[in-house]
């Protein structure tokens, strides 16, 4: 049985890394029909996407490769989607600019890791984050800034959460190419992530802290 499972997962991996969308989709459906667990399928897609992301960061893949891998990852998560209770809720968005790639990568990785993710999209402003926190009551707010001119928006968002009496009810995770750990501490954020895998680890750490009352 384990050998059959491994063969199904290998077929998914081979087609994923060859960017064969329809073949990967068919292999995924066969795996699920054969009894491979949805959790295991989702985990494989997560690992494959992280491998593609690493190749992109090493210069081995182009942005076109990464975009194709993202589409494959999204397809796999959709097919493997199970009705389970999310371990936490995250609101995510890009403050002030139209940059989306990094934010979308983290959104998919969070979903694969068991989080419910509310995506506010791009060109989001602090008021929209605050309104979403009031409406959705998330555990974590993940706000990205990709250009220096938008850095004040992260500070403003944290300040507005404080003024609304929401700051102690949610953990704030910030990131983006122009941010730093020092900046996160300066504005009063709870966590900072430089890269996507780090963002997932930070989200899990912050969720644990929230549940422990830290």
What are these regions (language model features)?
Residues 80-86, 131-135:
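Glycine-rich phosphate/diphosphate-binding loops that line cofactor/substrate pockets in enzymes
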Residues 190-195:
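Short acidic-hydrophobic, aromatic-tinged amphipathic segments that line or gate anion-handling sites
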Residues 85-88, 167:
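Short, flexible coil/linker segments at domain boundaries that flank nucleotide/cofactor-interacting
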Residues 109-112, 119-189, 202:
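Cofactor-cradling patches in redox/metallo enzymes
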Residues 87-120:
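Glycine-rich active-site/cofactor-binding loop and its immediate structural neighborhood
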Residues 1-83:
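Long amphipathic alpha-helical segments
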């Amino acid at each position: 049985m384990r050998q059959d499972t491994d063969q199904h997962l290998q077929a998914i991996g081979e087609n994923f890394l060859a960017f064969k969308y329809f073949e990967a989709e068919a292999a995924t459906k066969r795996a699920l029909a054969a009894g491979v667990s949805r959790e295991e399928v989702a985990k494989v897609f997560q690992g494959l996407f992280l491998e593609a992301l690493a190749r992109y960061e090493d210069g081995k893949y182009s942005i076109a490769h990464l975009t194709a891998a993202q589409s494959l990852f999204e397809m796999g998560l959709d097919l493997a989607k199970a009705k389970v209770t999310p371990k936490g809720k995250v609101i995510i968005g890009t403050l002030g600019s139209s940059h989306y790639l990094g934010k979308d990568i983290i959104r998919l990785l969070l979903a694969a890791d068991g989080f419910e993710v509310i995506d506010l999209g791009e060109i989001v402003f602090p008021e929209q984050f605050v309104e979403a926190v009031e409406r959705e009551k998330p555990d974590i707010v993940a706000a990205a800034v990709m250009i220096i001119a938008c850095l004040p928006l992260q500070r403003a968002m944290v300040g507005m959460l404080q003024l609304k009496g929401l700051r102690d009810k949610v953990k704030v995770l910030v990131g983006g190419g122009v941010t730093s750990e020092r900046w996160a501490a300066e504005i009063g954020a709870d966590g900072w992530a430089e890269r996507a895998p780090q963002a997932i680890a930070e989200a899990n750490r912050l969720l644990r802290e929230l549940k422990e009352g830290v």
